[in-house]
Design a protein with these regions (language model features):
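A structural signal for short, hydrophobic/glycine-enriched beta-strand patches
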Residues: 1-138
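A transmembrane-helix-recognition feature enriched in membrane-embedded lipid enzymes
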Residues: 134-152
């Protein structure tokens, strides 16, 4: 199984609270499953100093995950690109074709649906988000799901 950690906002060279939770969940899984590889996926936002994927990889390495197990995908700017580019990286690096997608519960439906639409067998590793952080993102997700439904 290839662990795919979806990117999220960073602050300088540190993950945001939400990204921190995703990375903690991924690190725990990777430490318990040493045969699994990981793809960290996330580009660089206009207000970010680095691509999210670089910060994510550094965090996991600091947690004891070998850098040889981590593939960095730093071009993506959307959920669709996260999954699409991760699938490309999995093929290039001969990672397992099944994905364990690590993201917040509010984001998991769209991430899993995207993977399914691309023909990728995937499983969810949900991360809980504090309600006061999650509320605006739930509305954003509903808008994104509606947009995807209209444009598909």
């Amino acid at each position: 199984m290839t662990v795919v950690v979806l990117g999220c906002k960073i602050h300088g060279d540190r993950p945001s609270r939400m990204l921190h939770a995703r990375l903690e969940a991924a690190a725990e899984f990777l430490l318990e499953h040493p045969q699994s590889h990981c793809i960290v996926t996330g580009g660089q936002g206009a207000d970010e100093d680095y691509p999210e994927a670089y910060v994510m990889k550094n965090y996991l390495v600091d947690k004891g995950i070998s850098p040889m197990r981590i593939v960095t995908e730093s071009r993506s700017t959307s959920t669709l690109e996260n999954i699409t580019f991760s699938a490309e990286m999995a093929e290039i690096y001969n990672c397992h074709e099944r994905f364990l997608i690590v993201t917040d519960r509010f984001h998991q439906y769209r991430a899993m649906r995207t993977a399914n639409d691309l023909g990728i067998v995937s499983y969810a590793l949900n991360v809980e988000t504090a309600w006061y952080l999650a509320m605006p993102y739930w509305f954003r997700e509903m808008a994104a799901i509606t947009r995807d439904w209209i444009t598909s």
